[in-house]
């Protein structure tokens, strides 16, 4: 337990929090080029074939990012926007690809939560 005098002289050490998405260098998004588009299977209680892409970011880092929702048009050399956010049942996947920007198209026939999947507002039915 430090004395008041010691605290006045030195102060307390700040605890540094570790970044959950270090490859983005503190930016909210980063552009990158798809190096490889592949599928992964999730951890134990879940079963699926999840679509992921290995992306080389503009800062030189290579990350594995998740392609959200059903159906995508990504292939090798596609340019994508990457944001942080892990996928809980895919170990090592700590980033998401933003749908509806650059080469990643929005999700077809999406009606709800459209802003998350890059879909424009549909025309009103007559």
Curated annotation (Swiss-Prot):
The modification 3-methylthioaspartic acid is found at residue 89. The keyword Lipoprotein does not apply. This is Small ribosomal subunit protein uS12. Part of the 30S ribosomal subunit. Contacts proteins S8 and S17. May interact with IF1 in the 30S initiation complex. Residues 1-28, 106-126 are annotated as: Disordered. One of its GO terms (cellular component) is small ribosomal subunit. GO terms for biological process: translation. PANTHER family: 30S RIBOSOMAL PROTEIN S12 FAMILY MEMBER (PTHR11652).
């Amino acid at each position: 337990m430090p004395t008041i005098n010691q605290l006045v002289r030195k102060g307390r050490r700040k605890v540094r929090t570790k970044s959950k998405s270090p490859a983005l260098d503190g930016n909210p998004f980063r552009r990158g080029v798809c190096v490889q588009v592949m599928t992964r299977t999730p951890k134990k209680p879940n079963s699926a074939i999840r679509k992921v892409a290995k992306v080389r970011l503009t800062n030189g880092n290579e990350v594995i990012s998740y392609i959200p929702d059903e159906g995508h048009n990504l292939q090798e050399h596609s340019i994508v926007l990457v944001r942080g956010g892990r996928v809980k049942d895919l170990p090592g996947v700590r980033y998401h690809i933003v749908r509806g920007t650059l080469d990643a198209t929005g999700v077809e026939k999406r009606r709800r939560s459209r802003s998350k999947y890059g879909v424009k507002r549909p025309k009103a039915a007559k």
